[in-house]
Amino acid sequence: MTDITQILTDLIGFPSITPEDAGCQKYMIQFLEQLGFTCQQLNNGPVSNFFACYGKIGPLLVFAGHTDVVPVGEVSKWDTDPFSLEEKNGMLYGRGVADMKGSLACMLHMARRFIKTYPSFPGRLGFLITSGEEGDEFNLGTPYAMQKLEQQGIVIDYCIVGEPSSSLKTGDVIKIGRRGSLSAKIHLSGKQGHVAYPHLADNPIHRISPVLAELTSMQWDNGNAYFPPTSMQITYIHCGGHAGNIIPGELNLHLNFRYSTEQTDESLKTRVINAFTHHKLNPTIEWRLNGEPFLTNKGILLESCKQTVLEHIGTLPELSTSGGTSDGRFIAPYGVEVIELGLVNATIHQVNECTSLQDLNTLETMYFSICEKLLID
């Protein structure tokens, strides 16, 4: 068993189903403190967070990630114990091996090797870790930790988020940004009545239908060189009882935007409200901004990562903003150069989640090389 797989074995053994950390961060903190890192816990309710830093002056490169994992689903469908790392034919199985305890193991191993190789390097190396990335408690995680760091005057120059960015092999895709995410819960009141007497009722389904037709056919924007066009999806509609002879008296609807840098949350809100106003409706709308879009399309970090990937796999990486949101959205607004570089995402959140030993070794070597370029060269 290699050093990386031993670290990964230890991390997988903690059943850290979001937002529970289950001991992962205690393990990581002890590991880093033994290397000379200064660590501070930034826990917030059920979510565990910590920041660790090695070095006193110079540019600060932070590796960010999360210790929480999604639920395993039906354990009987797994070929292995999801919380016990198992190797089969060069593949490593367990919940979180790809998303993203494999990256965490690479980060820890790289940090130990880097400090042993360069004990007095002219810069700072950091870790920003949360257990609140996978669930609804994300606001208690990285956003909270970043606020605390700002209050302490800690400024991050570069950040590598270890999310599983890769498609076929480690490094073939680097995420240089993510779309924004805006959700809305809409409530529209009508008047319940008998279907035989519609003139005595007010059907909210009929009232909202032209609004939905307008919103679902709307071209929000054309995207740009880095982002696809903004998309709106209706995710939930509920209209009360199940009786076939009752006109419902109320309607609840949820929708979500994934939006490009061509929009802001306020511009989207305005267009939704205007659509309702145009049809003389005044619903109650509860908005939730899950994250603004961010983009790192240039800079020292990106160039270092591109060159590193080219050196290790022989091709330049695809630069992408596809996929869901990540905690990079909470770090970039502080003026930080942010990219995502991690393992292959083909099996994340699935039964029999896995990664290859080769990909682990490649990722650790890439992390080491990037540190050399940013903190040594």
Swiss-Prot record:
EC number of the protein: 3.5.1.18
SUPFAM superfamilies: Bacterial exopeptidase dimerisation domain, Zn-dependent exopeptidases
Biological process per Gene Ontology, one example term: lysine biosynthetic process via diaminopimelate
GO MF term set: acetylornithine deacetylase activity; cobalt ion binding; succinyl-diaminopimelate desuccinylase activity; zinc ion binding
Pfam short name (any one): Peptidase_M20
Residues bound to Zn(2+) 1: H66, D99, E163
Pathway this chain belongs to: Amino-acid biosynthesis; L-lysine biosynthesis via DAP pathway; LL-2,6-diaminopimelate from (S)-tetrahydrodipicolinate (succinylase route): step 3/3
Keyword Zinc in record: yes
Keyword line: Amino-acid biosynthesis, Cobalt, Diaminopimelate biosynthesis, Hydrolase, Lysine biosynthesis, Metal-binding, Zinc
Binding site for Zn(2+) 2: D99, E134, H349
Cofactor: Zn(2+); Co(2+)
Cofactor note: Binds 2 Zn(2+) or Co(2+) ions per subunit.
Catalytic activity: N-succinyl-(2S,6S)-2,6-diaminopimelate + H2O = (2S,6S)-2,6-diaminopimelate + succinate
Catalytic machinery residues: D68, E133
Keyword Amino-acid biosynthesis belongs to the record: yes
InterPro entries in UniProt: Bact_exopeptidase_dim_dom, DapE_proteobac, Peptidase_M20, Peptidase_M20_dimer, Peptidase_M20A
Domain of life per record: Bacteria
Similarity comment: family membership: Belongs to the peptidase M20A family. DapE subfamily.
Record HAMAP family: DapE (MF_01690)
Function according to Swiss-Prot or TrEMBL: Catalyzes the hydrolysis of N-succinyl-L,L-diaminopimelic acid (SDAP), forming succinate and LL-2,6-diaminopimelate (DAP), an intermediate involved in the bacterial biosynthesis of lysine and meso-diaminopimelic acid, an essential component of bacterial cell walls.
Matching NCBIfam families: dapE_proteo, PRK13009.1
Assembly: Homodimer.
Protein name: Succinyl-diaminopimelate desuccinylase
Organism the protein comes from: Legionella pneumophila (strain Lens)
Gene: dapE
